Curated annotation (Swiss-Prot):
Residues in coiled coil: none
Biological process, per Gene Ontology: chromatin remodeling; chromatin remodeling at centromere; chromosome segregation; double-strand break repair; G2/M transition of mitotic cell cycle; nucleosome disassembly; regulation of nuclear cell cycle DNA replication; regulation of transcription by RNA polymerase II
Subcellular location: Nucleus
Alphabetical list of InterPro entries matching this protein: Sfh1/SNF5, SNF5
Keywords: Cell cycle, Chromatin regulator, Nucleus, Transcription, Transcription regulation
Molecular functions per Gene Ontology: nucleosome binding; transcription coregulator activity
Name by which UniProt lists this protein: Chromatin structure-remodeling complex subunit SFH1
Organism whose genome encodes this protein: Eremothecium gossypii (strain ATCC 10895 / CBS 109.51 / FGSC 9923 / NRRL Y-1056)
Protein family according to the UniProt entry: Belongs to the SNF5 family.
UniProt region (Disordered), positions on chain: 61-80
Biased composition (Basic and acidic residues): 64-80
Any one cellular-component term (Gene Ontology): nucleus
Function of the protein: Part of the chromatin structure-remodeling complex (RSC) which is involved in transcription regulation and nucleosome positioning. RSC is responsible for the transfer of a histone octamer from a nucleosome core particle to naked DNA. The reaction requires ATP and involves an activated RSC-nucleosome intermediate. Remodeling reaction also involves DNA translocation, DNA twist and conformational change.
Length: 383
């Protein structure tokens, strides 16, 4: 070969998500069987010494392999070449010409050697159904006939929190109920392929069950069309060590601005990384579902919106001399994981407290109404 491999020919995604800085795929914390038992965290030890031991052991293994290969017969050597040729998942970079000299850097060469050959998703789905390709054709037909641009999307936020072989998979995304171009089983196949867990039926079944449970739970709630209702949304979203917090007014019946468009505008205005776009949209969808649930249960008063607007208007200018409207401005803070969890716990406590207070007010109003009705009834009977 006279040039490097073509672009996007190799993928190293399965190795990148195993990095400690990526919270998608993390190692589960060891549990203690006894309260006095000590949990050993091997990451606290000197990894350089362990790495030197592994390198020395690998060198010894390579020397033994060279001596054993020299003693092989012709038949064994041919069988070994056939086995290497059948391994299509690993790139062949040993015999590749490098005119630019980029592969002389150890980190770049290591990245190439640890990567896999990228496979089209159609081939992954065909391999999952035994190579017949029927599932792919059905999905394409359903997607062409069942989903169009005129159909209103019903989006449900999905969260995954699974454990598999000592690792935790924590992820979030959105699922459109009116888009039938991809089934849950096909999505699980592609998801496991990206994580380098191909043909793992147990993990695929866990993913399908987790998504299906959340779809059944929020399907009716997400399909409800509410009237012209203005609400206050206190949105918090954390990604890595950054915490985004905002307080704004949202009309649940206004379809001119979607959560995805709102997230894109926020990312552009605040100069955040594009990874915040799906995170903000997902958090906004979750907040909208919670508000819809409160509205259906009668815990939301549509006549009074605490937006702080001047002259009692639904929206507009806010007259705030003390803080100059700082409570209605977006904030981005760099916090530790413990501080972010503390903020989330405080937010949940405040939401539960406000819900209890609103329930008490509704109960008092109901009692007063009942008492007035009894007084009116007694007055009528006397007359």
């Amino acid at each position: 070969m006279s040039q490097l491999l073509p672009q996007a020919y190799l993928t190293n995604f399965h190795n990148r998500i195993r990095n400690e800085d990526v919270p998608l795929f993390i190692t589960a914390a060891p549990t203690r069987n006894h309260k006095r038992a000590k949990v050993v965290n091997y990451s606290e030890y000197d990894n350089d010494l362990l790495l030197d031991d592994f390198i020395e052991q690998d060198q010894n293994d390579d020397d033994e392999k060279v001596h054993s290969d020299n003693g092989k017969g012709e038949g064994e050597e041919v069988g070994h070449e056939d086995a290497v040729a059948s391994n299509n998942n690993l790139p062949d970079l040993e015999q590749q010409d490098d005119p630019t000299g980029i592969l002389r850097y150890p980190r770049i060469r290591e990245t190439f050697l640890q990567s896999k050959i990228a496979v089209r998703y159609e081939q992954v789905l065909e391999a999952g159904v035994g190579g017949s390709g029927e599932a792919v054709g059905i999905a394409e037909d359903e997607g062409a006939g069942a989903y169009s641009s005129s159909s209103q999307p019903v989006v449900i936020p999905i969260r995954l929190n699974l454990e598999h072989n000592g690792h935790k998979i924590i992820d979030f995304f959105t699922w459109n109920l009116n888009d039938h171009s991809l089934t849950l089983e096909q999505f699980a196949q592609i998801y496991c392929q990206d994580l380098d867990f191909a043909h793992n039926l147990s993990l695929q079944n866990q993913i399908v069950a987790a998504i299906n449970d959340q779809l059944q739970e929020y399907e009716t709630l997400a399909s409800v069309v509410v009237p012209d209702l203005h609400v206050i949304i206190n949105l918090t979203c954390n990604l890595d060590s950054k915490l985004y917090e905002d307080n704004f007014e949202w009309n649940l019946n206004d379809q001119t601005l979607s959560p995805e468009q709102f997230a894109e505008l926020v990312v552009q205005d605040l100069g955040l990384t594009r990874e915040f776009m799906p995170a903000i949209a997902h958090a906004l969808y979750e907040s909208i579902l919670k508000i819809k649930k409160d509205w259906l249960e009668g815990h939301l008063n549509p006549e009074h919106v605490a937006n702080g607007a001047a002259f009692g208007c639904l929206s507009g200018i806010r007259l705030d001399i003390d803080t100059l409207g700082s409570n209605w401005c977006p904030k981005v803070e760099v916090l530790s994981q413990w501080e972010i969890e503390k903020r989330e716990i405080e937010k949940e406590r405040n939401m539960r407290r406000l819900k209890r207070e609103s329930a008490k007010v509704d109960d008092r109003l109901a009692r007063r109404r009942g008492k007035r009705r009894m007084d009116d009834l007694e007055t009528t009977m006397r007359i």
